[in-house]
Structures are given as C-alpha cells and as structure tokens.
Amino acid sequence: MNSIVVHYKELALKGRNRPWFIQMLVRNLKAALAGLHMQAFRSVMGRIEIEMGPETEWEEVRTRIARVFGIANFSPANRGPHDFDALAAAILKDLGDREAASFRVSATRADKRLPFTSPVVEREVGGRIKEVTGWRVDLSRPALTIHLEMLPDGAFYFFGKDQGAGGLPTGTSGRVACLLSGGIDSPVAAYRMMRRGCTVLFIHFHSYPILSRAS
C-alpha cells in the first residue's frame, strides 16, 4: 500500500471553520510522523491522504497515528481507477495469496455526482473478485471486507480499518493547566481535555523532604 487514508468524524460537523480544524489535524499528523519518510499530505473530500515513501515502515506509522487526536479511523490504502475491470484487477493484485472464507465489498461515493451508485460498484467489483477467487459472499459477517471510496478522479481501496483516538485535534481548544497528583484522576482528566483539543500544561509540586514521600 502506498497511501494512508485518514477519516475524521467530529470535524465533519463543523461549519465554515472546518478547513482550520482540518489544517490543525494535518499539522499534528506531520509532527507525529516526522522522520518516517512521508511524501505528501492532502485533504481529499472529507478525508486526508498521506503518501508514504518507499522506506516507510507501516507498523511505526500505525503506532504514531493511533495517538493523534481528531481521527476516527485510518487505513493503509492504494488508488485505483473508476473502470471496474481495472479496479478489480488492482485489488486482486494487492490481495496476492491472501485467503478468505468469505468477503464483501463495501463502497461509498465521496462525490454523489459520479455516474454510478455504491450498490452498483459493490456488485460489479465484487462479482469480478468472486469470479477469480471463488470466495463466498457474506454481507453480514465476512472474513474480509474490501472497502472502496469512489472519488472524482479515481478510487481508494483498502482491506481494514484501525481505530483512531477520536475527539478534536490538539491545539484547537486553547491551553489548560493540569495539576498532577498521586492518583489516577488527574491524568484521566488531562487525557479527556486533550481529546477535546486542549493543549495541556502539566504541573507537579515536588514537596519532599518537607513532606513525606507518602504524601
């Protein structure tokens, strides 16, 4: 896979200031992935595409993106054409020797003006894959889900989703101070505020030896 498709949920509810929130999320992603040979970051119709370099290690990328607030889910992905034959061929090539007892194709259209519906894409691409692999179609509990996202200039396809941290991008809701005590409540409160977009400044009073180590 050459790209990463990053989806956000809460940001999509924003109004005219939505581009600023997306810009902050892209900034945070760039900071989190610094040094991993990423080649490009693009906002593409309700999602963010990150282009990976040839030296990029996916497992390290996965670990870092999972910690970035503002993301609903993300996936390693490739681009394909609108043509159903060529798209199915590209998917089959990337599937390689993978085996699955059952599968389904789940398609969405980023642009509703495209001259085909999502069910048509699922039926046409899924039929071609079934013809080659012989896999059983299961729309309820498939062993493998092939996700398609149809864009005006092509399509993304990917085979799974990693859960993101959710919330809002860090830096979109101002700064707060958090007094760290010896309990679990203060770090939990800090995490919840970070998830709402706050930049947290941590404060701790080291009072030993005036007070005992227990206090």
Region spans (language model):
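RNA-binding accessory domains that recognize and position tRNA/RNA substrates
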Residues: M1-A177, P187-A214
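Conserved G/P- and acidic residue-centered "switch" motifs that form tight phosphate/ATP-binding loops
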Residues: G183
